[in-house]
């Protein structure tokens, strides 16, 4: 793995160089600046294993219609349907167009989202009331740029290409699972911010949560792993709702699960949290 101080340079050189192959023109100065800014602001950059890559879901040159048809078929096998637009108060996003750049963005997004969703036990989405996966680009929530969000009010989770090519691929998969857990939590308690007493009881006595996950956005935040006993990541410390979603995300993402497993070998609080979420997952899968 590259030293952390070299990662932004490596991203710009390798990933942006690859983007130059899309179409016939080199990226504009504005695009290059936006790409490099997205790379620097990727909160999973410091904890990324850059060797982990996701296979394309379709041949190079697949049309937008072909990519959408492939996504529709694979999601149908999970009892899910895709949506290609988003209309929710406080949120904005754009639909993918049939351009080289958008096809490449959708191909990358699908290469991460589809296998992530296929990791779940059969029937779990139906049991939790998830019906749709919204796949868009340029997502923002209350003006904050986002890659994903839960949307239980429309029975959906939302995943977006938002300069995704500049970011850690496995970090995006972690976000897929993280946001789905927020969806699960809302279905269980009708509240995104439920302070579950059973969960809080697992914390070491010195655990103090922050002011919620939104406070981490736009500040160059780096989501470092296992900063304190009982916490899988720095972002987990922002609130019990983020703590749960982070443990779930690390547990479900193959590139991160081994580290969680290692930490639980000497952190009994984190081990208990992982066991609790495994029980939630198994209960929901088994009750379908």
Task: Cite the ranges covered by each PLM segment.
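Bacterial N-terminal signal peptides that target proteins for export
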Residues: 1-8
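C-terminal motif of bacterial Sec signal peptides marking the signal peptidase cleavage site
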Residues: 17-18
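Post-signal peptide N-terminal segment of mature Sec-exported envelope proteins
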Residues: 25-48
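Acidic/histidine-rich, surface-exposed loop or edge segments in extracytoplasmic proteins
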Residues: 49-55, 76-104
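Low-complexity, intrinsically disordered repeat segments enriched
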Residues: 63-87, 210
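Auxiliary, metal-adjacent structural segments of Zn-dependent hydrolase domains
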Residues: 90-154
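Active-site-flanking segments in enzyme catalytic domains
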Residues: 129, 134-288
């Amino acid at each position: 793995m590259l030293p952390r101080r070299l990662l932004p340079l490596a991203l710009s050189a390798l990933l942006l160089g690859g983007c130059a192959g899309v179409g016939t023109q080199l990226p504009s100065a504005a695009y290059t600046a936006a790409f490099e800014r997205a790379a620097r602001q990727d909160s999973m950059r410091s904890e990324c294993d850059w060797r982990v890559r996701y296979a394309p879901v379709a041949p190079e040159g697949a049309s937008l219609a072909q990519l959408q048809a492939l996504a529709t078929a694979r999601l149908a096998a999970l009892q899910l349907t895709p949506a290609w637009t988003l209309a929710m108060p406080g949120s904005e996003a754009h639909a993918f167009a049939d351009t080289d750049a958008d096809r490449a963005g959708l191909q990358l997004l699908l290469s991460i989202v589809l296998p992530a969703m296929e990791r779940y036990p059969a029937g779990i989405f139906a049991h939790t009331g998830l019906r749709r996966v919204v796949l868009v680009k340029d997502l923002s929530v209350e003006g904050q740029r986002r890659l994903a969000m839960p949307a239980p009010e429309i029975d959906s989770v939302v995943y977006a290409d938002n300069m995704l090519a500049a970011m850690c691929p496995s970090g995006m998969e972690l976000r897929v699972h993280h946001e789905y857990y927020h969806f699960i939590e809302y279905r269980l308690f009708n509240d995104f911010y439920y302070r579950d007493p059973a969960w809080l009881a697992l914390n070491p006595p010195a655990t103090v949560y922050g002011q919620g996950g939104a406070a981490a956005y736009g500040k160059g935040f780096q989501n470092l792993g296992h900063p304190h006993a009982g916490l899988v990541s720095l972002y987990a410390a922002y609130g019990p709702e983020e703590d749960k979603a982070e443990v779930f995300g690390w547990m479900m993402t193959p590139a991160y699960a081994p580290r969680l497993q290692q930490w639980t070998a000497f952190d009994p609080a984190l081990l208990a949290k992982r066991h609790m979420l495994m029980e939630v997952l198994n209960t929901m899968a088994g009750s379908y």
